[in-house]
Amino acid sequence: MNAPDPVVPPLHDDEDDNNDVFLDDHDIIHEYVMDGEDLPDAEDGSESEHEEGDDDDFVHKFTGHTGELYSVACSPTDTTLVATGGSDDRGFLWKIGEGDWAFELQGHEESVSSLAFSYDGHRLASGSLDGIIKVWDVSANWEARQLEGPGGGIEWLRWHPRGHILLAGSEDFTVWMWNTDSAIVLNTFVGHGSSVTCGDFTPDGKIICTGSDDATLRIWNPRSAENIHVVRGHPYHTEGLTCLAINSTSTLALTGSKDGSVHIVNITTGRVVDNNALASHTDSIECVGFAPSDSWAASGGMDKKLMIWDIEHFLPRGTCEHEEGVTCLAWLGASYVATGCVDGKVRLWDSRSGECVKTFNGHSDAIQSLSVSANRDYLVSASLDETACVFEVGNFR
């Protein structure tokens, strides 16, 4: 993974049963266009440079880094524990509301590009552009393992939903999987023709999906490393994939691309099932995500738009217009979705109405990553301005 541009930013033995997909190619699609909601008027001129202390909305600001931040992750079990990483070759563990405590994740020799907590919160993985992954014991605050293998920078990290199995995508076109308790490589997934930019386990842990700059989605058997499906060509993306999300039933993959397209793939069959109905963006897609209910999803792009989609019917529910490109998003619950933007602002949107219900100030440069605390009371943003901000979002579920 190249450092983000300053402008654009245990396997179980259950039988291999396949869940039915609740939509298919024969669904009748009626597409309509919903007028986008204008943002509330900016106060004191939106073009002026942000000055700290002027209408800031954060309840905590972490300033321990000395370079741009690229990644943030909140613990799934500790409601105050946060990890951040960036271009200063360092990561930090710190706590919301405890400004005098921080633990430095030392030892990386290049930018810390990705962070991820294990499902139980006991482990934290940090990946770097030097191709090294470090696994940290969170309770003891020490490095438990160093994982090696990839020949290029780490693009992303994901944990198995029920074990200390770690998956990583690399710039060297490969995907690696380790047992982090022993540091043993379990499998290497080879087949992509370019950097592997996104990927994840399905929530049931049975399948791996990966997307690449080669414009393909690959669906893998994690035990055998067999490539079950390769999704490419018409009607799929024509340029590299940038982001990926999988629904809670492990049946659908939502992907975004540099070409401005968003597609839905049936994981079981490997078929594109959206009939090109999700075609509203005009620039690179930077982020996608399913709502907790799976019936809705969101996509954000450099065309300054957040699109809300009705996944059951392939219909646009709303267009949320921004002042600059949308770099990241996070669902706060069934109704509200947060966006991070190139203009340094974090916005909350009501997905039912398309209205911007809150704009958070606190950053002076582009937002690169968002994460929600375990109790969903806090939203944490990481920015190119070298800081992370914490915002209260408990009233938006």
PLM features: what roles do these ranges have?
Residues F58, E68, D78, W101, ...:
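WD40/WD-repeat beta-propeller blade-loop signature
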Residues I96-E98, V138-N141, T180-S182, P222-A225, ...:
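Short loop/turn segments that connect beta-strands within beta-propeller blades
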Residues F62-L69, Q106-V112, E148-I154, V190-V196, ...:
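WD40/WD-repeat beta-propeller blade N-cap
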Residues Q368-R397:
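Blade-level signature of beta-propeller repeat domains, shared across WD40, Kelch, NHL, RCC1
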Residues M1-E68:
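Intrinsically disordered terminal extensions that flank WD40 beta-propeller domains
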Residues G91-W94, L115, I133-W136, L157, ...:
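WD40-repeat beta-propellers
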Residues A73-T79, A116-G121, R158-G163, D200-K206, ...:
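Loop/turn segments within WD40 beta-propeller blades
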Residues G85-D88, G127-D130, G169-D172, T210-D214, ...:
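Conserved strand-to-loop turn within each blade of WD40 beta-propeller repeats
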